[in-house]
Amino acid sequence: MDSRTSTEYNNKTQTVFAVAVQSQSAKKAILAALADEEITKILDSVMYHSKSIVDITSENNIPHTTCYRKTKWLLNEGLVIVDKIIITPEGKKFSLYHSVLKSINVKYESNNVIVEAEQNFDIIKKTMARFYSLE
């Protein structure tokens, strides 16, 4: 089920597609993520731009180990992806993370939790471009 909403953005009206999440495990993961203050900070931080753990921790005052642990959980639940892996001139490797969702709407109706999520099409386009550019 799709629900469409029109929004005004930079003087242009655009249609936003929010998809109802059907999977119970995905619903639980989204609700658990929203209930955790540090995870919501991480999601907010990587919603529009890919960032490293170092960037996320410095922007949000989250302890380094906590940020790694919670980002790993988000990866396992499919709420963020590794957008890019960077190797420094010194040979160190680090990942840049990006959220797969742009917005989440949760409502409770008649003993039923309804979770709607808008996919982050920017990251989907970027991933598809990389996939199709492989020869």
Question: Which residues fall in each region the model found?
Answer:
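Short, cationic-aromatic polyanion-contact patches
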Residues: 27-36, 52, 83-108
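N-terminal leader segment of winged-helix/HTH proteins
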Residues: 1-30, 87-88
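Hydrophobic, well-ordered secondary-structure scaffolds
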Residues: 18-25, 43, 53-55, 66
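Basic amphipathic alpha-helical segments that dock to polyanions
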Residues: 56, 67-74
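N-terminal helix-turn-helix DNA-binding core of bacterial DNA-binding proteins
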Residues: 29-62
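Amphipathic alpha-helical dimerization/coiled-coil segments
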Residues: 101-135
